[in-house]
Regions:
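Vicinal oxygen chelate
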Residues: 13-14, 68-111
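Short, solvent-exposed beta-strand edge segments and adjacent coil->beta transition regions
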Residues: 2-6, 63-67
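Active-site beta-strand termini and strand-to-loop segments that position acidic
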Residues: 41-46, 107-110, 120
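Conserved beta-strand in the GNAT
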Residues: 49-54, 106, 115-118
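Core segments of cupin and vicinal oxygen chelate
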Residues: 2, 8-50
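A short acidic/small-residue loop/turn micro-motif
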Residues: 100, 121-124
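Short, glycine-anchored, charge-dense loop/turn motifs used at functional sites
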Residues: 21, 111-115
Length: 125
């Protein structure tokens, strides 16, 4: 049976991306021994999906084929986390594909990689 072990994100500045994603998720650095080319972050306690931040010259896309969904319990937590991540260096994205009454907000990390904060308690009325 396959499991997801590592999700790799392309970034232009590995050190900056490491600081952002460590602050965002509270992950620990497992290794940065790749000469500035890559860093692997692990969840606290070491169990769960890791994130590899790998240097890339490819620009991010406005509609990426793969992105992270970060989950929160309610709308208040969603807004608080969005504000916290913006303070860490993320940007809110004025996305052209929001549905009516979305349960998510779209942000971009300092490299422009888009991700969502999803409200798991969203009332679809």
């Amino acid at each position: 049976m396959l499991t997801i072990g590592v999700l790799a994100l392309g970034v232009s500045d590995v050190e900056r991306a490491t600081a952002f994603w460590r602050g965002a998720l509270g992950y620990d650095v497992r290794t940065d021994g790749f000469g500035g080319w890559s860093t692997v972050l692990v969840p606290p306690g070491g169990s769960g999906t890791m994130i590899a931040l790998q240097r890339s010259e490819t620009p991010p896309r406005d509609h990426p084929r793969l992105h992270l969904d970060l989950h929160v319990e309610n709308a208040a937590e969603q807004e608080a986390e969005a504000q916290r991540l913006v303070a860490l260096g993320a940007e809110r994205v004025d996305w052209d594909s929001y549905p009516d009454d979305p349960d998510f907000v779209v942000l971009a990390d300092p490299d422009g990689n888009r991700f969502c904060i999803v409200d798991l308690g969203h009332d679809y009325g």
